Amino acid sequence: MTTFKEAMTFKDVAVVFTEEELGLLDLAQRKLYRDVMLENFRNLLSVGHQAFHRDTFHFLREEKIWMMKTAIQREGNSGDKIQTEMETVSEAGTHQEWSFQQIWEKIASDLTRSQDLVINSSQFSKEGDFPCQTEAGLSVIHTRQKSSQGNGYKPSFSDVSHFDFHQQLHSGEKSHTCDECGKNFCYISALRIHQRVHMGEKCYKCDVCGKEFSQSSHLQTHQRVHTGEKPFKCVECGKGFSRRSALNVHHKLHTGEKPYNCEECGKAFIHDSQLQEHQRIHTGEKPFKCDICGKSFCGRSRLNRHSMVHTAEKPFRCDTCDKSFRQRSALNSHRMIHTGEKPYKCEECGKGFICRRDLYTHHMVHTGEKPYNCKECGKSFRWASCLLKHQRVHSGEKPFQCEECGKGFYTNSQCYSHQRSHSGEKPYKCVECGKGYKRRLDLDFHQRVHTGEKLYNCKECGKSFSRAPCLLKHERLHSG
């Protein structure tokens, strides 16, 4: 039986994802995956208890180049021959999407071509001119035993610490802990990237708006806001997304999957962050505070929308009527008013809606569901935003004021509708008769005159009404 020592290659310690598993990672996670594998390769060169010869191994990090000089043992017809090669691997620019093929080929293949590399540890230890910098004093030298037939392989380790290190790679043990927040990581490189959050280090700056980021992958994702690039396409409906994670969340709209449930009211959500924001409605927690007026919000997106009230910023403009909006989604919904498009249909009554949220609210008319309850008066609401608006009745808060007359309102939409009384604007036109209205809700009520639709039924006598206030007025006749 022949025994010899061989260096553990990168493929021995790499964390390998399948194509399907990698498809679930967003760009930042792929960047982290690449960094972790590079860290693993550096560990192979740096953590051994034997020193490596300067002329045989050299691994350095320059501006954007990884360079490696390897000694490769090649076997040919003429016998063993030592050949030295210089391998240069250029890092991808900030605008490159790292696919599975690129990650594995550039790192696993290019950096580990030394599959047949043999390290003569006794020779290198005598040189001693390239001191090894270790973090854990670990050696990554395998002892490989081959039978005379060449068909037996048994990896072993020179001491217990070597085995512990090797096992950690397979077990996913998170031994690197952040001193700031206590979060754990499998690899020191992942910890270093995470620590930039606490240090406030932002090395990557957007040339367009000047915004800074701690990771180049975050900058790349941000730049798509300016370019409009949406490389991730939904195979079901063709909708594009700038981030893979957003596409993964969108897929759940087609599958109907809502794995995150609220324990208070039972409402289900597609994403964990949606559940966390929703739960703050029950707890009353509002951690996001406006620096200008001090108003607090349960979600960062709500704070961002509110901030535009102070700046009056409305960057999204309708090409048809020149109306401006603070959000692109609001502009897209508005355009359907001009086109008459109502893509979301109710399966119960066939009524169409411009946005999915309106359809969801409409479904509650049929089910009678009102999951949001006011703790002050017990009144129930179908939508969380309606509850928040209602709570201002109890608090007396009227944060939205008319610039013309100074009148205060509970909601921005009420203030906006009121301002049309000064301007005389009636942007919502009936396609049947051309009559204009200040509010879309009034237009919806009016259109029922043409359609004959009466959604609100009296439980006592079965009489139907086109508007909820008419039903309430009628029910008082029965109650006396």
Swiss-Prot record:
InterPro entries: GLI_C2H2-zinc-finger, KRAB, KRAB_dom_sf, Znf_C2H2_sf, Znf_C2H2_type. GO terms for molecular function: DNA-binding transcription factor activity, RNA polymerase II-specific; RNA polymerase II cis-regulatory region sequence-specific DNA binding; zinc ion binding. It is found in: Nucleus. A zinc finger (C2H2-type) spans 176-198, 204-226, 232-254, 260-282, 288-310, 316-338, 344-366, 372-394, 400-422, 428-450, 456-478. The keyword Nucleus applies. Keywords: DNA-binding, Metal-binding, Nucleus, Repeat, Transcription, Transcription regulation, Zinc, Zinc-finger. It holds the Pfam family zf-C2H2. GO terms for biological process: positive regulation of transcription by RNA polymerase II. GO terms for cellular component: nucleus. Residues 8-78 form the KRAB domain. Its main location: nucleus. SMART domains: KRAB, ZnF_C2H2. The keyword Zinc-finger applies. May be involved in transcriptional regulation. Belongs to the krueppel C2H2-type zinc-finger protein family. This is Zinc finger protein.
